[in-house]
Structure formats: C-alpha cells, structure tokens
Amino acid sequence: MGAVVGVVGCGRWGLNHLKTLSELKTRGLISAIHACDIQPRKLVEASKYADTFCTDWQTLVTNHHLDIVAIVTPADTHHDLAISLLDYCRAVFIEKPIGLSREEASSIIAKVQQTDSKLLVGHILRFHDAINEAIEIITTGEIGELQKIEFNRITNRQPPDNPNIFEAMAIHGIDTACYSFGELEPSTLSVSNLALNANKYPINAKLSLTFPGMKEACIEVGWNGNEENREIKYFGASGTILVETSTSSKLIIKTLGKERIWVIDNSELPLMKEWQYLLQPLNNASQQAIYPPPEAIIRSIKWIELANHKIQNTSTELDESIE
C-alpha cells in the first residue's frame, strides 16, 4: 500500500511537488495525494494531480490520515506549520529554508525527535546526480585537492513578492559548498554586488565564503537576469569539473588540457530522488531520520542569518549616503 501524502502550498514549486507525486503514484509508491492552499483559485491546477483540494491545513488533517506532509509555503510560515502538522503525520518534507532563524530550525528538529518522526529539508542539490558524481570524482583525486567552488544561480524570472535572494537561492549555494567540502563549516562570509528592490528586499548578490585549509566558495545569485545561468564549477589543484544543474545527467571534466564529458545513465530529477528517499520505510534503520543532518540544517540558517544582518548594515549605509 502506497503512502498518503499531503501538500500544503500549491504555488509554482508546490505544483512541481504535485507533478512528481503524481508520477510516483503511477509507480505504486503513493496511494493518494491531498493538496491544500489558502487561495481557492489554486484548485484548478492542483486538481490535475491531487485527489482532493482544501483551503486550510486543519481541514486537510481532519479529512485524511496522512503519512507525509510537504510544506511548500513562504518561509515565514514553515515553523508554525511544521510544529502543528507533526501531530498528524509520520514525516514532513519542508522546503528550504526550514525557518527564518536557528531558533525556529532547532524547535522543529526537537519536535521531530520528540514525536519520533522523519524530516527532510529541501536542500535539493544534495540529490543532484551530477553533483554527487562530481564529488565522487573529486574523492578519486582526478582534479587534485578541491580548492574552490563557483556557484551561479541567475534566473530570468522576476522576483516574487517580498523576495529574499539569500533564503531563496543563496542557501542552495551555501549548503552545496559545505556538502561538497565534506560538511565543512565556513570561516567567514562577505556580501557584494548587492541589489535591493524598491522595498529594500535583496534580489541580487554575490557571497564569498572562506573555509579552513585556504578553501573558498563564490556564490552569485539573482533574479531578472538576461539569461538563465545554473552552473557549479569545482576547481581542484590540477583540474576542474563543470556541472550544469539544469540537467542531472552530465558533467564536464578538464585535466591537463584535456576535456571529457561524463554522462550519467538512468539519471532522475533531484525532486523525484528527494521523494524516493522520504518514501523509504520509516523503520529503515540505515536511513537518517533527519536529513540533511541537524547540524547542516542549522548551519545553512546560521549563514543566511549572517548575510541578512550584513545587508541590513549595507541598507543603512545606502540610506545615509542618499541623505
């Protein structure tokens, strides 16, 4: 019998969750999909993939016995929703960021542990086949010791309402850098090339992270780009690996002036792999109950908090210069 899944939040990314779940339903891994969004108009799109639709989470949990609930709503709602929904399901999938502060993240993790539940936070690039293949190649020493990571995520989409580029995109770069360096904790962070919208929300930025061992990561993220740029480049002592995150099946390796393309067979989209991971039996002793590990979840929030703090100072300086 497949799992019964609820999805709270049916916006652009919520619909991607519903599409993925619909495919998993055809494979027999899911028996029912129940969608929820506070906007009634979302019914039209959601009903293409979900068995039912409602406009509040209380109705969702009252009408259905749920195994898993995905929270795909604005970040400022994640904490309260997660704390409430953990009383009604065995697992939660919370899109990143898990919350807006380390306190919120710790509170959710504590509730997961208290209820003996499972938690998956949507650090999706940890499930990207090409990134994981690149890390495997790096461990063989083919490009030498990993020294630098360049992470680019520029989209030609317009920013959403009340945007925060750190919570929406930079968090992917921070987590991917730490993950690629073997869960290494950064030492310092600086923010440059900052662009704010009319309401002083950050919409473009470049983050520079340093790590122990003279390692570094440069993260460039933003909306309103001229074209899409979704590249991650790994720089080793004797070569490079380029990953296009828009595809999970290919990477380009350059060593000693030679280039080769590595094609990954039977690659699946990262969101599909996230759901497959979460759908493994809850009593699977080999699987972590919380993923990424709690310290990695909190680490990402910590550095996003620091980035937000830095731009508050920058915003004040901009105001003073205008005056």
Regions picked out by a protein language model, each given a short descriptive name:
Residues 1-48:
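N-terminal Rossmann-like dinucleotide-binding module
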Residues 30, 88-90, 115-117:
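A short helix->loop->beta-strand "cap" motif at the edges of active sites that frequently abuts
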Residues 76, 99-157:
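A contiguous active-site-proximal alpha/beta segment in oxidoreductase catalytic domains
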Residues 16, 41, 262-276, 292:
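Active-site loop of classical SDR/Rossmann-like NAD(P)-dependent oxidoreductases
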Residues 168-248, 275-285, 322-323:
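Contiguous beta-strand/loop segments that form the cofactor/metal-binding neighborhood of enzyme cores
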Residues 17, 49-111:
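Beta-loop-alpha module in the N-terminal Rossmann-like domain of NAD(P)-dependent dehydrogenases
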Residues 68-73, 212, 277-323:
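C-terminal helix-rich "cap/oligomerization" subdomain common to oxidoreductases
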Residues 94, 119-121, 243:
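Hydrophobic residues in well-ordered beta-strands that form the structural core
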